[in-house]
Each structure stands twice: as C-alpha cells, then as structure tokens.
C-alpha cells in the first residue's frame, strides 16, 4: 500500500500502480510521466456548471452509443501512459468500452476553469489533448464570469478558438448539440 502525507511528495509510480492506488483515494489525481498531481476541489459555481453540462449532454445523447463521464472518469492521453481528470468528457468510440477505469478517445472534453488551473487547462493540458485524433471539441468554461471558449478542430485538422458570452448560442459539432450559454450560468453569482 502506498501512503501519502500532505507534506511529503507523491512517490513515483508506474501507470498500473497509479490506477490501482487511485481507486482507493478520496481525492482525484492526474498522472504525468510517473508523477502524481492532486486535483483541488472546485467552487460552488464549478460544481453547478459541471452538473449542468453533464445533464445537458446526457439528455441530448440519451439512448445513443456515446458515454458521458464526470471528473471521476480519467482520460488516458493517446499514445502515452498519462492520465487526466477532466470535468466532463464524451466518448462515442467503441474502443473506450473495453476499459472500466479510463477512456482514450473522447470526442469532447470540458474543463471548468478555476483561477489556479486556468493557465494549465489552456496551455499544457490542451497540448496533451490536441494530439488525439478523435477529439473534436475542447470546451473551457469560466466559473468566475459568463464566458466559454471552444477549441474546435476543423476538417483540415486545425484548431479554431471561438469565444461565447451571455446571450450567445454555442454549437458542439462533436455531439450535434447547440445550446444557449445562459442555460449553463442561470442563477449563478459572480
């Protein structure tokens, strides 16, 4: 058994050890090149936004072949042994049904931004996801203002960044869904 105290660094683990260890943890951790990184808790807005997006996706995709995951569902970064914990993910790829611990081929990944993770979500984490041939949409949703950035991969394989704000309508081509931005932020205080 691997023990960890808050003051000690996480031990370096193999991917298999990480997945076994992570199943027994209360908190979520991402895994990158043998290192474990604790994922902090989110704000009330963060939680509400994640639930609303998950519900929206579930209602839209109900009865189909796609699966929607919350932050408990890890993504294995394609062609690596690294794992992330996005706030919401959608996969429609049958290869992802083989694992009970993670998916590898999402078509949509959502990160609800926190001040402490925003730079990583926009930079390093996007670069990890961008190499996935199945990923079409990467949605970055602010939890401190009404603003959403959609990174959409076009037919040429180029990533376009589209910004949405209050009263805009957002389209996720990856799952064939269009919705009003205001639906996600209704009643939230900033």
Swiss-Prot record:
Pfam families: Uma2. It comes from the Bacteria. To Synechocystis PCC 6803 sll1609 and slr1290. This is Uncharacterized protein slr1290. It comes from Synechocystis sp. (strain ATCC 27184 / PCC 6803 / Kazusa).
């Amino acid at each position: 058994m691997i023990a960890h105290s808050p003051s000690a660094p996480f031990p370096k683990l193999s991917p298999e050890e990480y997945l076994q260890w992570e199943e027994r943890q209360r908190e979520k951790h991402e895994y990158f090149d043998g290192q474990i990184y604790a994922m902090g808790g989110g704000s009330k807005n963060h939680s509400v936004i994640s639930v609303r997006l998950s519900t929206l996706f579930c209602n839209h995709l109900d009865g189909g072949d796609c699966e929607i995951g919350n932050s408990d569902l890890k993504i294995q970064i394609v062609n690596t042994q690294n794992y992330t914990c996005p706030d919401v993910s959608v996969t429609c790829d049958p290869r992802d049904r083989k694992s009970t611990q993670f998916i590898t081929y999402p078509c949509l990944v959502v990160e609800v931004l926190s001040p402490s993770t925003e730079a990583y979500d926009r930079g390093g984490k996007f670069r990890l996801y961008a190499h996935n041939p199945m990923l079409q949409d990467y949605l970055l949703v602010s939890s401190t203002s009404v603003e959403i950035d959609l990174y959409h991969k076009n037919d040429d394989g180029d990533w376009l960044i589209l910004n949405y704000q209050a009263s805009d309508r957002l389209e996720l081509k990856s799952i064939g869904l269009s919705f009003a931005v205001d639906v996600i932020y209704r009643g939230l205080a900033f």
